[in-house]
C-alpha cells in the first residue's frame, strides 16, 4: 500500500486556508484525504466543536503532552498553544490516506525537519486591503486585535518562499481548483504510482 502524503498548509489569518481545506475535503472521500485535528489551549470560537475542529485542552494538559513528546509540532500563537499529535498523523499516513495540516510557519518548519517528505502549500490573500476586510468581517475582534493580526500576517507571509507551492486566494473556486491540482499531481508522482500499481507493473514486465 502506498504511504499517504502529509500536506502542510499555511497562510495568514484571513487568507481563507481553512475554508479551502474544508471545501477540498467535501470533494474527497474519507479514505483518500483527512484533515489533522490539532490540540490547542485557546477558547473555542462560536460553532467550533471539540474533536472536530480542535481538541481543546488546558495549559497543564498541553505541557504534559509536550513532556511525553506527544507532538509532531507545537507552537505558541497569540498566547495560546497549538500542537499536532505525532501518533495520530503517522497512523493515518500508514493506511495510505493523505493528511492535511493547517498550521503556521513555525509549525511547518518543525514538520519539515521531522518529515522531509511532506509537501507544503502557502496561501496568500490578493491584497492587504482584502485581508483587512476579511479580518474585520468576522466581527469578533477589537481594533487592537485586528492590528496585531495584520502585523502577524505580514510576518507570516514573509516565509512564503519556504514552501513547495503557492496559491493566491483571490477567486475562491480558482484557488480550490489549484489546490485540487496540487493533490492530483502529487498522487501521480512516480514513487506513489510504483507502490500503488506494483502488481500491474510486475505483470507487464514479466517475460
UniProtKB/Swiss-Prot annotation:
Subcellular location: Cytoplasm
Coiled coil: none
SMART domains: GuKc
Record keywords: ATP-binding, Cytoplasm, Kinase, Nucleotide-binding, Transferase
Catalytic activity: GMP + ATP = GDP + ADP
Keyword Transferase: yes
Principal subcellular localization: cytoplasm
GO cellular component terms, semicolon-separated: cytosol
Segments forming domain Guanylate kinase-like: 4-184
Enzyme Commission number(s) from the entry: 2.7.4.8
Binding annotation for ATP: 11-18
UniProt-listed PROSITE patterns: GUANYLATE_KINASE_1 (PS00856), GUANYLATE_KINASE_2 (PS50052)
Assembly, per entry: Homotetramer (under low ionic conditions) or homodimer (under high ionic conditions).
Family the entry assigns: Belongs to the guanylate kinase family.
Function: Essential for recycling GMP and indirectly, cGMP.
UniProt name for this protein: Guanylate kinase
Native source species: Escherichia coli (strain K12)
Amino acid at each position: 500500500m502506498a504511504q499517504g502524503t502529509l500536506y502542510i498548509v499555511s497562510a495568514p489569518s484571513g487568507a481563507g486556508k481553512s475554508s479551502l481545506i474544508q471545501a477540498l475535503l467535501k470533494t474527497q472521500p474519507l479514505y483518500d484525504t483527512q484533515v489533522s485535528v490539532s490540540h490547542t489551549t485557546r477558547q473555542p470560537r462560536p460553532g467550533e466543536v471539540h474533536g472536530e475542529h480542535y481538541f481543546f485542552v488546558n495549559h497543564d494538559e498541553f505541557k504534559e503532552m509536550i513532556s511525553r513528546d506527544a507532538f509532531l509540532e507545537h507552537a505558541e500563537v497569540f498566547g495560546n498553544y497549538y500542537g499536532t499529535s505525532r501518533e495520530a498523523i503517522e497512523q493515518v499516513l500508514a493506511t495510505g490516506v493523505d493528511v492535511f495540516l493547517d498550521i503556521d510557519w513555525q509549525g511547518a518548519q518543525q514538520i519539515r525537519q521531522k518529515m522531509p517528505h511532506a509537501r507544503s502549500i502557502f496561501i496568500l490573500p490578493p491584497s492587504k486591503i482584502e485581508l483587512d476586510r476579511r479580518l474585520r468581517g468576522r466581527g469578533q475582534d477589537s481594533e487592537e486585535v485586528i492590528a496585531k493580526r495584520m502585523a502577524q500576517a505580514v510576518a507570516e507571509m514573509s516565509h512564503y518562499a519556504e514552501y513547495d507551492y503557492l496559491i493566491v486566494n483571490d477567486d475562491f473556486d480558482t484557488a480550490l481548483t489549484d489546490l485540487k491540482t496540487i493533490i492530483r499531481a502529487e498522487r501521480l508522482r512516480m514513487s506513489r504510482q510504483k507502490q500503488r500499481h506494483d502488481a500491474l507493473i510486475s505483470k507487464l514486465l514479466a517475460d
